[in-house]
Amino acid sequence: MYKRQLVNYGVGLCKYTGSRGKSGASDASAELVAYVRKVLDEADVVWQMAELGKVDAGGGGTVAMFMAERNIDTLDAGVPVLSMHAPFETVSKLDCYMTFKGMKAIYEA
C-alpha cells in the first residue's frame, strides 16, 4: 500500500481521516472496509487504499468527521487528484470512471 493515491490506479479509498486528535477523526471498521472491497471486486472496479494526509498537518478535510460524530461508520472514497486546489488540477479518466462504477456498485448492493 502506498501512502498516497496514484493516478490511473482506480478509485481511492481512505480508511481513516482526521485532525485535532480523536475529536475530529473517523476510522472505518474492518467489516465496512471488507464489505466495500468485496462489492468493488465483484463489480470489477479498480481501487486503491491510501492515506489522505498526516493528521494535524493540514489539508485532507472531508465530511467524514461529521458522519463519525453521529456514529456512522464512514469510509472516504473519491477520485485521486494531482495538485488539488491549484490553478490546474489533474485527474485520470480511468479513475473518474472507476469512481462512478464503484459508487453505482455500492448503491446497487
Q: Each PLM stretch: what is its role?
A:
Residues V79-A109:
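His/Asp/Glu-rich mid-to-C-terminal helical/loop segments that flank catalytic regions of hydrolases
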Residues M1:
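Active-site loops and adjacent core secondary-structure elements that bind or stabilize anionic groups
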Residues R4-F88:
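Active-site-adjacent substrate-binding region
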